[in-house]
Amino acid sequence: MKVWDMHCDTLAELRYAQQAGKPKSFLHNDLMLDLERMKQGDYLLQCMACFVHLEPEREKSPLLACLEEIDIFYRLLEQYPDDLMQVRTAADIQTLLTSGKRGMMLTVEEGGACLDSLGALRDLYRLGVRMMTLTWNFKNGLAEPNIVPGTDDMWPRPANTTGGLTEKGLEFVEEMQRLHMLVDVSHLSDAGIWDILR
């Protein structure tokens, strides 16, 4: 049975390792995923998330961090052209099925990386991003997360059932639909999910 995995944080982990001066190989590593395990697990497609933090002490610029992870994604495709193939369309999946390669689809986990700019969203699409969460664990200009902000010290953390999408978030969903970019509702509040379904 072929595996189609919708999420991994390997791009961010490779970026962190690179920033720490201890780069890791995608061929074999101790991260969430590597090429050897993709082959052993009979992977068809792996969604590769560009994960960024919105906290200024963690990231100088969420958009820059996202672009650095996109660069890592493309360098992996260049490094392993006989093993990996980028997936942007349904037709690419059909090609992938007969290619003997493993597919990788570029995604973004934290819509705040766009800095509330529809132009940045369109640019990420042009760079190959085909799925994006509107938020992660932080309220941003698009939406609220599925946890109540400011409850980091509580366990279990209370669910956020009231804060949904902002007006800008609704604009983003409409533009993502126009672009045929998947809206990933992971991490989104219940109210945000209902806003999308309406």
Model regions: which residues?
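N-terminal hydrophobic targeting/anchoring segments and the immediately downstream early-domain regions
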Residues: 1-162, 198
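Loop-centered beta-sheet repeat module
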Residues: 159-197
